[in-house]
C-alpha cells in the first residue's frame, strides 16, 4: 500500500437514540444512529406485522382518505 493516501482508521463510539453505545473502527469522527440491535424490533423478537412505527399519523390519514372505498 502507498503511504499517506489512505484515511486514518480510529476506534469511535457509535451512540444510538436508545442510549446504547457500540465501538467500531471507522474513518468517521462521530456516529449517531436511530436504531441499533438493542432496540430494533426484529432483534427484540417482535415480528414486523406486530409493530408499526407511525411517527406522523400516516396510517390514520390513509384510512380517513380511503375509508369509503370498496375493495
Curated annotation (Swiss-Prot):
Keywords: Metal-binding, Ribonucleoprotein, Ribosomal protein, RNA-binding, rRNA-binding, Zinc. It comes from the Bacteria. GO terms for cellular component: ribonucleoprotein complex; ribosome. Zn(2+) binds at residues 16, 18, 36, 39. Binds 1 zinc ion per subunit. GO terms for biological process: translation. One of its GO terms (molecular function) is rRNA binding. Its cofactor is Zn(2+). The keyword rRNA-binding applies. InterPro entries: Ribosomal_bL28/bL31-like_sf, Ribosomal_bL31, Ribosomal_bL31_A, Ribosomal_bL31_sf. Gene3D superfamilies: Ribosomal protein L31. Pfam families: Ribosomal_L31 (PF01197). Belongs to the bacterial ribosomal protein bL31 family. Type A subfamily. Part of the 50S ribosomal subunit. Binds the 23S rRNA. HAMAP family: Ribosomal_bL31_1. This is Large ribosomal subunit protein bL31. The gene is rpmE.
Amino acid at each position: 500500500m502507498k503511504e499517506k493516501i489512505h484515511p486514518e482508521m480510529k476506534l469511535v463510539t457509535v451512540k444510538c437514540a436508545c442510549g446504547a453505545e457500540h465501538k467500531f473502527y471507522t474513518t468517521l469522527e462521530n456516529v449517531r444512529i436511530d436504531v441499533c440491535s438493542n432496540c430494533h424490533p426484529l432483534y427484540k423478537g417482535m415480528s414486523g406485522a406486530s409493530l408499526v412505527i407511525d411517527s406522523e399519523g400516516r396510517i390514520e390519514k390513509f384510512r380517513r382518505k380511503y375509508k369509503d372505498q370498496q375493495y
